[in-house]
């Protein structure tokens, strides 16, 4: 399976139009995969979209227009919400190259400032966000 930026919607990957790649293309990009433990961030075209990988796409090949974010010791949902926050999105907007097709370089992603409270607090914040979101919907 091959995940495109067009498939990345609403902080997940849509499963209604799954794409596959040929064996020859797979051989060229077989090391560029993403797992359900990672997050994605789009880095070309639509820049700064962030989301989780559904189980059906575990170890799928990922477009070169998105990067996977691998992390340890951080609540995945907390990191996703941080990356989607106005605070981080404004940083992304400022460090996106504007020449030709807009692009967000990996080194710029590594330089993003992300608030990182203790892990227990991360889970508490995620719980509050989910509570608030359920009230609003």
Report the location of each language-model feature.
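Conserved structured core elements
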Residues: 2, 27-31, 60, 86, ...
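Short amphipathic beta-strand starts and helix->beta connectors
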Residues: 53-55, 95-98
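Short Ser/Thr-interspersed hydrophobic loop/turn segments at strand-loop and sheet-helix junctions
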Residues: 2-11, 32-49, 62-66, 71, ...
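Conserved aromatic/hydrophobic "specificity hotspots" at molecular recognition or selectivity sites
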Residues: 11, 69-74, 116, 128, ...
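A short glycine-rich beta-alpha junction/loop motif
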Residues: 46, 59-67, 74-77, 97-116
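Amphipathic alpha-helical coiled-coil/heptad-repeat segments
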Residues: 90-95, 108-137
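Sequence-specific dsDNA recognition surfaces
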Residues: 6-36, 56
């Amino acid at each position: 399976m091959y995940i495109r930026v067009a498939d990345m919607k609403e902080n997940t990957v849509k499963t209604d139009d799954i794409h596959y790649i040929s064996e020859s293309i797979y051989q060229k990009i077989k090391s560029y995969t993403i797992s359900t433990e990672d997050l994605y961030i789009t880095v070309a075209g639509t820049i700064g979209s962030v989301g989780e990988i559904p189980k059906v796409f575990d170890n799928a090949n990922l477009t070169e227009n998105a990067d996977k974010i691998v992390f340890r010791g951080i609540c995945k949902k907390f990191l996703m919400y941080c990356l989607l926050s106005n605070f981080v999105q404004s940083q992304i907007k400022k460090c996106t190259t504007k020449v030709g097709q807009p692009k967000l370089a990996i080194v710029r992603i590594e330089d993003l400032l992300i608030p990182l409270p203790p892990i227990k607090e991360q889970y508490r914040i995620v719980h509050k966000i989910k509570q608030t979101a359920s009230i609003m919907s």
